[in-house]
């Protein structure tokens, strides 16, 4: 929620009023539905806290580079100094939890499956964003 508010404020500075935007107008997305339906803690941590946050770190770094190239230093700074470090922390937290939770071969396999499915879904969603909206440098938080 903190990042959403910061991004909405930045969009306002750029001339877009995000107050009327409802990110859930189309309902929950496929990745959220997948994460929400995972039955075990190790799967939820592997898919969400570890993998999804790792994706966010990579996508945010790409977005920072895009903003720098486009000359939008303020947005790049917001992502570089606040959002990306938070996402990196979330990913590291997921890693430390996984080291404790994935203590058996079965738990490790469940974590691997959940992580792989998260990566596949993220790739599908990124492909759809490119095909339908031409978006290829979307941030990941």
Label each region the model flagged.
Residues 1-141:
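Non-heme di-metal
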